[in-house]
Amino acid sequence: MKYLLPIVPLLISFGGLAQCDQNAIWNNTSTNEICTEINGSVKYWYTNSLPDHVTGTFPGQGNPHSISAQQTELTMCAYPLEAGEFTDLLIGGFNALGQCPTFEFGLATNGIEWDPVAAEWFENPNTGAINYDWNENALSPLVNLGTDMIDAHVQPTGKYHYHGDPTNFITGLGITSSEHSPIIGYAADGFPLYYKYIYADAQNSNSAIVEATSCFILKSGNRPGDGTTAPDGGYDGTYVEDFEYDGSLGGCLLDQCNGRFGVTPEFPNGTYYYVITADYPVVPRCFAGTPDMSFSIGPPPAGCEVSNGESICFALSIEPSATEIADRLMIYPVPSNTGMLNVFIAGNQVIQPTQVSILDNSGKIVKTEAYHQRISINELKSGVYFLKFTFDKTEIIKRFVKK
């Protein structure tokens, strides 16, 4: 859990939150149904994976499969924390032995999964050998995966899933460009997902509503391949590897995972969150937190598609000490016109963070290091920043200004 000044502690009562009858959900094979519940630190989702909006015609459109009800159970952390490093959805490719090759990104609030990674790669035209370094972009008009009008299609099992922007679903939610998007889903790591209309200032809920745009661009020049063992020709978006992230783009609000830390209507004290954008990647291609293995793709005997929430998720502390730590933790001088910040934790009880991160005003992590009572900010430009202190099962954020 993260806190922004002023600190507002969130007290959670564990237990008593179970409410889902998964068998009743799975027995419904004709209409959309979904339920979620929290048990301890893990959030459980049960859905029959039937869409609640108009879809394309299946079988057809290059896809021979029919939509059918599923018995889907997924888990994620109810109180996610940032991992300190990003995890790609494409873990190692389908040639990776002994591990799950890819992750689905997450789940929409209607129970339909986002699975943006295409199981298609560059193929040697002479030998049929697969080059797993070049993954086809499912959203490219040059790639035909038999998707419908909202870039969704059906797996051989009958499961309907999204590859891109599910506009029919979005329209049904009544989302417009005049107000901040509601939560439209959750990533496999538990952080929320929003549509493209968000606050211009990540830390100010009174700022203008803007359309967040992708910070990815097509690479310049030509691919290095020979057209036989690897693709050649200009970078045109046929492959995921045709794109690169450029955080220096004007108006860039999002990080490499199409996300940022900031306030939202549902999280007035701030959270990390993801955003669906109009252009590539549209659906995020990496995680800022730790994804649950129930969203991985691969054989269950190898640990794929099996929940590991009990081992990766942490419950929020409901003890007064969480609030006390926030009140006792002080940084000075603020504002700072020196190259150092001092940290002081009042009281006799020895409580220390394990690490500290500096976030800029957009919520992007500038640096992370082991905790010290004196923190160098000499390299920072003038502006508003945040210090994120990571304790055992609590994160506390303090704002400061570098002059």
Predicted regions and their residues:
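A glycine-anchored, Pro-Gly-centered beta-turn/N-cap motif
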Residues: 158, 270, 381-384
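Histidine-centered catalytic micro-motifs
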Residues: 157-167, 272-276
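Sequence termini and other peripheral, non-core segments
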Residues: 18-64, 279-281, 286-321, 380, ...
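Short, acidic, Ser/Thr-enriched surface-loop or helix-capping motifs
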Residues: 108, 187, 358-360
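C-terminal outer-membrane/trafficking sorting elements
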Residues: 1, 6, 14, 321-403
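Solvent-exposed N-terminal domain segments of exported/luminal and surface proteins
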Residues: 19-146, 150
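Extended, compositionally biased non-globular segments
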Residues: 189-191, 196, 200-299
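Short loop/beta submotifs within extracellular cysteine-rich repeat domains
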Residues: 84, 114, 168-173, 280-285
